[in-house]
Amino acid sequence: MISAKMVKDLREKTGAGMMDCKKALTECDGDLEKAVEVLREKGLAAAAKKSGRVAAEGIVSTYISEDMKNGSIVEFNCETDFVSVNELFVELANNLSKQAAFSNVSTAEELLEEKYIADESKLVKDVITELIAKLGENMNLRRIAKLSVDKGVITSYIHGGGRIGVLVKLACEKEDAKLAEIAKDVAMQVAATNPLFLNRDGVDTDTLEKEKEIYRVQALNEGKPEKVVEKMVMGRINKYYKENCLVEQLWVKNGDYTITKYLQEQSKEIGADITVEAFVRYEKGEGIEKKEEDFAEEVQRQMNQGK
């Protein structure tokens, strides 16, 4: 006899629907653990069907250690805005960023194979698969990154409820409470302006030569004499640096300052040099090609799923 309590226990353990739980228990003669396995197998099959669908929504989540010496950032994708704000989805994303901070792995693929920080009886990939089955959408841990510092701080900034996330590494020989505020300013700058590089040294040769060639052709097309073209090219390259290198950008909170000048002013106040050593900026779904569907196609897909 399958009791209501047995169904309730199985539902709480798996998140599956009530009728699915009752069928699984009946199939397994009331054996709870076997019923869990049956539902997991069915859940895995359902998840496999969903894995081909584009997951371009989701959130960016960050985690900063209490001493602000370590930080991590992850992008965790789903298919719709609706699921991206689901409590279970957000909780998993936040746990994944926390796990990344304390893990020795450096890629999302490696993190998927680790034991889950909130339940070490399961692997991260299996926890994600279970949530796919429960919420009915494909999900993907797309990427992770970590920063650490010995002297200085790591901080983060999240914009738009997880649409954009930033990690910043600030180095300073002197420990000062104000460093966290300064790092937050820099992180907000990165979120707002999306710099491509930290400084000029970070601009790779291929990118630089490509930009120079574009500016050279532009100058020649403007009918400028050959002898002044090179000077114009260098002027435009300097402008490129100022727009795309973080430390040369104008500070969004005060256009009279570049980020370098802002850090120099703060260094004087603290009494020690402050430098930005690294940053990471994630924007959810960037670079993912979304499949466009018209309304009729969407209705047909839902009807097919219901068969």
UniProtKB/Swiss-Prot annotation:
Task: Determine if Protein biosynthesis is one of this entry's keywords.
Answer: yes
Provide a GO CC annotation, any one: cytoplasm
Pfam families reported for this sequence:
EF_TS
Q: Could you state one GO biological process linked to this protein?
A: translational elongation
Q: Where in the cell is it found?
A: Cytoplasm
Question: Could you tell me which residues belong to the region Involved in Mg(2+) ion dislocation from EF-Tu?
Answer: 80-83
Q: Name the domain of life this protein comes from.
A: Bacteria
Q: Does the record carry Protease as a key word? A: no
**What keywords are assigned to this protein?**
Cytoplasm, Elongation factor, Protein biosynthesis
Checking CDD domains in the record gives: UBA_EF-Ts (cd14275)
Q: Which GO terms describe its molecular function?
A: translation elongation factor activity
Q: What does this protein do?
A: Associates with the EF-Tu.GDP complex and induces the exchange of GDP to GTP. It remains bound to the aminoacyl-tRNA.EF-Tu.GTP complex up to the GTP hydrolysis stage on the ribosome.
Q: Which HAMAP family match?
A: EF_Ts
What does the similarity note say? Belongs to the EF-Ts family.
Q: What is this protein called?
A: Elongation factor Ts
Q: What is the source species?
A: Clostridium botulinum (strain Hall / ATCC 3502 / NCTC 13319 / Type A)
Q: Which gene encodes it?
A: tsf
